[in-house]
Amino acid sequence: MIYKKQYGQPFDTESVVGSFLPMMETIPYLTKEPDGFSYAMEPQDILYGLGENVRGINKRGWVYESKCSDDGNHTEGKSSLYGAYNFMIVSGKDTFGFFIDYPGKVTFDCGYTDLDTLRITVAEENYDLYIIEGESLTDIVHQFRQLVGRSYIPPKWAFGNAQSRWSYMNEDEVREVVANYRANHMPLDAVVLDIDYMERYKDFTVDAQRFPRFADFAAEMKAQGIHLVPIIDAAVKVEEGYDVYEEGVKNGYFCTNQDGTPFVAGVWPGRVHFPDMLNPEARAWFGSQYKVLLDQGIEGFWNDMNEPAIFYAEERLKKTFAQIEKYSKQNLDISSFGAFTGMVAELSNNENDYKQFYHNTKQGRMRHDKVHNLFGYNMTRAAGEAFERLEPDKRILIYSRSACIGMHRYGGIWTGDNHSWWSHILLALHMMPSLNMCGFLYEGPDIGGFGSNTTEDLVLRWYGLGIFSPLLRNHSANGTRRQEPYRFKNKAAFAGILQLRYLLLPYIYSEYMKAALHDGMYCMPLAFAFPEDDFARRVEDEVMIGESLLIAPVYEQNARGRYVYLPEEMLQVRVKCSESNRIETNVLPAGHHYIPVELDEVVFFMRKGHLLPLAKDGKKIQSVADVDFADLRLLAFAPDGASYEYYTDDGETKDYDKPEYFVHITLDADGNAKSDRATVKVEG
């Protein structure tokens, strides 16, 4: 059951799509405070949720802020990252969920100030509070997801492997990447283009020197099974003669200063204006700009810098230059030098600059900081709504860096500028179920790490987790070590692990689609699947993938294995990636086990009475188009037989709910397999 309590006059974030809900006179569980709420926690209570954030699956013990922030240092001391996800579940003496529908800053003190107190602070008393009661953790998530609407569904090819780099500078570099993947029998479906494909970092342009025949090049790549995925940034360059800029100024589509003039900030192209994503007309206009690339054969995009990031605001920059002039005439001692460096550092993403510009919304003029968390959401919404108008029957890939709840209906996310640190493998694992709770099913990290220099063993281990993420993308920063998998010594292991991803695609796609269509979770903490197991509640480095699989990736350098907790008897599946993905299986009892895992191996675990549908002929697969989703082999741990609801569709259109897409597969105790649809063949 969901209950609602309204405080003040909330801004309509359009995060909620559910129908009328009973209004609460008094709120259960939470104690009302002057600026928010509190909850007295027992020692065994666990806090789940908050989407993409640092630290563990259990959020207890730290303070988090819902404040979309451009911060590439994902360390334990941070309180906010790129998104705002105000949904949390308390599990313990009471079990309930709550969602705070508010577009500004919300602080979740999860036992940081007082170990036994959850304290939620909302910047203003204008918000909606939803309390969700359910029979289980999964039921609470299900009800919440129905409240906020169906998760985004990408095209099937978007579940393939993507290779990215800041930046592949021209057509020949992209061709080289594709050729090396193909020569080394490594499947690939997409090459991602970073900012240098543009003409001087201007949105919706292509550099004619580097990509002189972009439409022809996109067609050339598509003929090889490769989709180009260009970046779109959140700001428009100030430049006379640039059509997007000219149209935006003429029609008043940009965010403004208090006096009504366009607000000027600086990012990649220098001085820019921010499109007013909360103005419905401006949002529709910005979304329509994607057509220039759709018309050239592009079928996927990624939205970046949409917190929005600010390198500098023009007025602050002027004051800084003036102060630097004064400092240039001084002898800088420790105090003045500290003031000087601090002043320059505070140019970027300064909180006061977010109070200087305004939006024209359906509810009137709003200062940006009061609706800050909606910017990235509505940028991706602009694209999603435009795709509905321009390509109503076709799925287009779109994922974003910044997000808040509501955006999950329009696109996915990647988890931002991580680093080539072993701790960030574990961080990526922690983020997966928390994002799933909030509706963001299509998500994934930068495999191998974006910042810093990676190592071969780190990339291999990261793929050991990444092949189970819906978004599988290797991405790295300019100036760091190149980390395309074919550049490393153990090419056979990389080829095998990527081929394994494609062998698993029938299961991964089926579980993703069922989670999206039924408002469920593709990835969940062990406690959600095994609610009666007290130890499963404590496990922070294992998760369930779909209904059948438990994964426990290795995330420490030089480790040749790890301890794993199994809540029940399971089938251990060991895949020898360097040996054409040879599979070894053995049954393990419930409990704790040390599991050896060599660098060229992937090990996962399968529940008893479950089936795992796999594709065939991994070595022949170059892209998702080569995967036959209708000719399957089954891996089973089913001594008494088992059944599985398998989902498959054309992967391109949007008629997801057709009954014929759901296939009932059974396996009897003698190993005989059959499906109830003639269109799908299975063998045990």
Regions from the language model: what does each represent?
Residues 89-94, 257-259, 567-568:
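Short acidic-glycine loop/turn motifs at beta-strand connectors
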Residues 82-86, 93-95, 103, 126, ...:
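Extracellular structured ligand-interaction cores
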Residues 64-68, 81-84, 175, 283, ...:
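Short, hydrophobic/amphipathic alpha-helical packing segments
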Residues 1-155, 165-166, 171, 178-183, ...:
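Catalytic and substrate-binding clefts that recognize carbohydrates or anionic sugar/phosphate headgroups
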Residues 150-164, 261-274:
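N-terminal small/glycine-rich loop or linker at the start of catalytic domains
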Residues 41, 50, 91, 99-102, ...:
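Glycine-rich, histidine-containing beta strand-loop boundary motifs that form or position
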Residues 187-494, 529-530:
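Aromatic- and carboxylate-enriched substrate-binding clefts and catalytic-loop regions
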Residues 374-375, 380-396, 402-413, 428-431, ...:
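Catalytic core of carbohydrate-active enzymes
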